[in-house]
């Protein structure tokens, strides 16, 4: 495979030994494919499947009125164009959505009262607007009210039937009580369970239990039918004085009988009493032709009658299921009945559970059973047979009320061995009988119960399906209202629009996207956190579990997770195991089950055919691991191979293997597969490592890891933060905000031959980090479709770059790295190595209040001129102003109510005028802890109101920018068209042209000096080319028209004003960029779960340094490694050092190359990239490309050590050796303070360190006075509320122990909730007096009031 554009700039040296069979699938396809399935975009209406939005409409409609004379039918639906594009929605706080219009048909019927037939009287068809459907962006997110959100996929229990037991916990004897549960997609749950007496009961929706036979009778089965369905029948007959039973050899096999078996004629004893019946005995029975076996009468007594037995008159005298007694046998003999059918129940392989349940059941017929079920479901309502029948039918057999779903039917069929059609999604009688059958067999010891945590029993509901369920809820809410409107009004005058109220529909959609537990604010800290959020699987949410109820089994790793769900990446804390991540190669199939890819193995040799298997399919195969040596690679030592089969590990010979893993990283998620040497880390630390990579803040200067895993480029590409080329071509124009690629011309094509890519510049992410895109290409460079042409945040040359490569020493340093603290060099701060930019958004609204409108103004009461220096005439801060805490960003005044004025105030008003007193200053000020530069201001004014000067100015700038963009895009398209037209005309004969004779050929020189306007006057001889030129011109006109319309639409939206929340007149948003340098208290981490807090920034000259004078950047504590068992960081240190050393070698070679020494650079590259694929690609590069790559590699050769297939010890040693570094990975360091060498050699190398989003600036907080709680009058808590520090119970004990009585008193009174005391102490401080007097704390008053609320009369007696 040829190198991509970015690989030609910088190629990773790969230490992996296993080549990949298939590429990693698109990492956000989980979201995108599900949403496409929901809308079925791009599918013709006639070819749409009955799923998604279309399927919901089909399932709810047609709706009939109560009389059955009017029906509303669904015809089709169409989505309109979104009103605002993605960027506009983000800026204006709008939802990115498209209007949904549905065509409905209202049919009015005439009924012939005599014949009862219906004829159509009238049909009215109409498009009805149902509301807005949010659309998914190209990156798999939704823009809801201006914020980017992700709908997380939900893991839930698959519909179908599940068999289980209580593990002996219910009953004291430890007996296993078996149960079964039929779970539909929607509808009533049906449970079957045994009680401790071994009777079988059924429950509907977890209500009171009923004997299972009541349910079977309600289905129309008689006692005889029930027994016949679940039991085999034995026949006894009386021959003379001896009872005989029909011989069934299978039933006798292995049994010991209490009596001997004797041949009836010869009297030969075939089996002795108390001896086991063997296969030899059975063979002898067949040889002797014994069909009947003589038995004693005792064997018959205690059996159960299989069928009803009637007397001569036809009256039933013995009912099916009755126990046979001696009297009954005598009665039958007296009645001349010589043959009797009994149930085969031997108490060992078949138990009498169902027969005993039948005996317990008081109901005798179907009607009684139905009424019993009705009473249980609707207690207190008078039952009738018809109502009971309707209720029972609606519970399980009506498709409107009960839906197993296709998945449920599939699972039902496979578990019960049925062949019911998949479109039959209600319960069938066979399903219920099949469930009871398997339950009885389980009780008899046949078969196994299901494992609820098996991924064959859990499925994923992605965006499309979750949205489909919400749409159904909305339509069902509308259904009742539609039916009532159709019934009440005059049907003749109705049109579809009249009967529909779309409010419930749009409310449900809005509620789902806005407040559902699964609709989450996207984690946009860095590209990895975005991807992980979209690939997340949650077991929580509506219809899922709750944290409190989830036990260990649900959270645990299950063998079926292999290749489907990552065993490493899950949150720490209460959600552990409930929130998971999809594995790298996993995909979700149409039924919602997770599939993993496997490579086929035929006769011991792997072939290039890859199949995706679900957890259920996988169990039937023997699967080898990715590193198994099969086929040509196998040696004699590989006669037995480690495999997986039926959830267990085993060894097998190569010829028995069916499949092989496609890659070693298919078991883990994206985040875990970014950790090099993952195989050398403890799982707990790997979990922390994968979680902390998602918290890494994008830095100003990005740096891809020297030690990577090879999938950094995949993450960068699929995350959507980079820009990829749509078509192959040559870069025509590049600046900071736009890239223009001139696409390769396809013969005969008239489409515009340019692609224009606009870059995002310094915009704010959800987590306040900075999103900025930077071009990677230069003019004239060639790019291929799919190449990365611009970097985004946390990416470098098309690879994920979350942190920086820094030189680390593992050694203690004066206690500054005690307990995971980190000592860093001043260089990291001075050179902005870990500096990041954060953009904070502050907004203020001017509302219409009862006392009048608030006003955004520069004219505020009691504010000095100095505070207004950065505000413009409208009272809004200038862009570019440096601001610090307390500065006014937007001036605002609010009217206040009239109050009684003191004489002094009256005097002041008389002197200084009215304005100052009737308004108060409610300006937006910068909160503590934020200081930076204003980078953007946006003013939104309510539609219809006059805009202020600043808003007009912003609009003018925006329009000027839009006009400039439109002109530039038009110029680019016209220039490209002009070039193509000139190329087509070159050398062609003309009929007429300015300055040419008919028949002359157009020359290049004529084209060079002719302006574009002359080309329009040229008439060519060749009509086909003329037509092609006209096509190109037509496309240019169309493109120009499209650009003009887009420009006009955007201008119109700007001038129109904004849709603001009710009561808001104006809204101003101010964006402030804050530069955050590294400082003590910031949290840093590596990729192996090695985290710590910066304790000290050490001067460069004090840091330990190497013999060549290079000081280390970071000193880490070596004690952080052994107990944590994350040795991966040490291996990374060694390999990182070697990679950096190789960079020095390339730097030397580059210097030699510049001096004109031929081939030295190429030889150096050949030494580094020594595996076959890479060396072939390097050999194909030109000298210029090689020099270009060398410039990027001189600071270190990036390596890839894929998870579970990475560099081994010998690789690292050999690389250290090649780089001219000690193979021990240790070196003599010198103390920067004393200049003396340390006693021992120290492990030194390059580690990839991340700066995490836990910055001390966001956490540090101080308060002197601030807000108080309304009820208790105690200070609020937390930085967000500007709260105080809690002085809790234990802190009180500490002060009591010290005997600090006065300190304690002020803590519990004036500093907390003594309202009067607070005021007094303020006054006394003002007077210069430092004494205070404590009053009654407000919390005491609260206690008194609470006691009074309990009707206890508590009064306060004062000792005066």
From Swiss-Prot:
Entry's Gene3D superfamilies? 2.40.50.100, 2.40.50.150, 3.90.1100.10, DNA-directed RNA polymerase, beta subunit, external 1 domain (2.30.150.10), DNA-directed RNA polymerase, subunit 2, domain 6 (2.40.270.10), RNA polymerase alpha subunit dimerisation domain (3.90.1800.10), RNA polymerase Rpb2, domain 2 (3.90.1110.10)
- Which Pfam families does the protein's record reference? RNA_pol_Rpb2_1, RNA_pol_Rpb2_2, RNA_pol_Rpb2_3, RNA_pol_Rpb2_45, RNA_pol_Rpb2_6, RNA_pol_Rpb2_7
Supply the EC number(s): 2.7.7.6
The cellular component terms of Gene Ontology attached to this UniProt record, alphabetical and capped at eight, are: DNA-directed RNA polymerase complex
Its biological purpose is as follows:
DNA-dependent RNA polymerase catalyzes the transcription of DNA into RNA using the four ribonucleoside triphosphates as substrates.
Q: How does it assemble?
A: The RNAP catalytic core consists of 2 alpha, 1 beta, 1 beta' and 1 omega subunit. When a sigma factor is associated with the core the holoenzyme is formed, which can initiate transcription.
State the name under which the record lists this protein.
DNA-directed RNA polymerase subunit beta
Q: Which organism is it from?
A: Magnetococcus marinus (strain ATCC BAA-1437 / JCM 17883 / MC-1)
